[in-house]
């Protein structure tokens, strides 16, 4: 269960926020040092630690759902590339996967990833490549039917070349979209991370053929200097 922030500073350094500065160690690239310094000073990283979430990405799906309301009690959700499980921590209580909301429908959460994921009550994690032949049928079998939501925070390994990374993640996102077409219930929702860079127009065209509404959203918790956005497609036509 996520811990509630106490509002107290227990660092012993007084009651004001401190900016952490990281020295560049011998053998460490300057870019790595900058990333580490940004990570240590990121308010969402600090908040995730305080509230018991597995990563800052939890706030992204939280903010998207606050706006579009797709994680509702009784929803059957598939999370592609679910590690480390931060999105699951947000989704499980919202879809009532544990049945804690009396009188509300009980949802199902299936997370799949190439790596093993630490267990979480109310979530069902499986090691599976969603691009494998028959993966869609396997997921539907686990769900006991079609999904109401397919969501993805996946990103291809960074090459250090912006345009290459953009094309890689767009290819991954398009593959996830085709997976969603196979497993979504009519009226369902597809949510996926994209990187701006020019090729996202083709994905938009594809999704507009299959969904009633398609939006590009940059949630507040996405870093301002990042090209990251999320596509939220609602009203799957089947």
Swiss-Prot record:
Catalytic activity from the UniProt record: uridine(2552) in 23S rRNA + S-adenosyl-L-methionine = 2'-O-methyluridine(2552) in 23S rRNA + S-adenosyl-L-homocysteine + H(+)
Record-listed E.C. numbers: 2.1.1.166
Record-linked Pfam families: FtsJ
Transcription found in the keyword field: no
Subcellular location field: Cytoplasm
Gene3D superfamilies: Vaccinia Virus protein VP39
Span of the signal peptide: none
GO cellular component, one term: cytoplasm
Catalytic-site annotation from UniProt: 193
Top-level taxon: Bacteria
Main location (coarse class): cytoplasm
GO-annotated molecular function: rRNA (uridine-2'-O-)-methyltransferase activity
Residue positions binding S-adenosyl-L-methionine: 85, 87, 113, 129, 153
Keywords linked to the UniProt accession: Cytoplasm, Methyltransferase, rRNA processing, S-adenosyl-L-methionine, Transferase
Listed SUPFAM superfamilies: S-adenosyl-L-methionine-dependent methyltransferases
Top-rank EC class of the record's enzyme: transferase
Cystines in this chain: none
Protein family (similarity comment): Belongs to the class I-like SAM-binding methyltransferase superfamily. RNA methyltransferase RlmE family.
Protein purpose: Specifically methylates the uridine in position 2552 of 23S rRNA at the 2'-O position of the ribose in the fully assembled 50S ribosomal subunit.
Protein name: Ribosomal RNA large subunit methyltransferase E
The gene coding this protein: rlmE
